[in-house]
Amino acid sequence: SQNATLRNILDAVYKMAVRKRKANESRPEGEKYAELQRVRLGSRLLAYLPLRITDELVGILRSFKDKASRVGVTQFIIQTHFQSPLEVTPEAKKAIEAILSAGWIITNQLVYTVAASGRGHKAKLRQTLNAMGVVCYYTFSVKGFHENYAVFAPNSRSLQEQQEEKVFGLIPKEKQKELYRLIRYERPLGKKLSGFLKENRLLFAATDRSVLNLPA
């Protein structure tokens, strides 16, 4: 989409948030509308076309965050889709830094295919993304039906990865609230997340949910 399209979409979202808040001023308790608290945009541009993340686009994101924060929106998320640490090019790093500078956070979803399920592959991806301030959101096992049978990794491999590889990034219980506050409130996140990992001697933060699907 063009920048103008994104600007129009975000303007519409902002106006909706304003309308709900205004309407709630005259509605009784128990009948108020649920107000907008989170905006999440899904895009794989960071992985396959990072040069699309221009100063103008980042400015649109920053401007929206500034005004939406004043009407109750507290979370601004770009959900992206890196499958391999090899996709994290210098251009991708620059794009990530630009978006983080606008006050948004970036989360990553991984589709757990055969190519992405090699020993140590996911651990390295977590480490690479965390080093730049990207939070791993979930690892998704596909169902293994006819349309994706040739590329799916079975649930057993995902379970093995959790027990033998993901375990090295588990956050100590006494540090979980600190990490939550960091991800939830600290902006820009990049160096702060790296500092947390270094301070706690962690290779990465295993924050991603491992989502299993049948009949895989």
Each PLM stretch: what is its role?
Residues 56-59, 93-95, 120-125:
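Charged helix-capping and loop-helix junction motifs
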Residues 59-73, 101-102, 128-141:
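Structural recognition of alpha->loop->beta junctions
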Residues 46-48, 74-88, 95-96, 100-119, ...:
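Conserved strand-turn element in the central/C-terminal portion of the radical SAM core barrel
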Residues 1-2, 13, 99, 128-130:
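Conserved catalytic-core segments centered on acid/base and nucleophilic motifs
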Residues 7-14, 96, 123-126:
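Short, well-ordered alpha-helical packing segments
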Residues 123-216:
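Auxiliary Fe-S-binding modules of radical SAM enzymes
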Residues 1-71:
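Conserved Radical SAM active-site core
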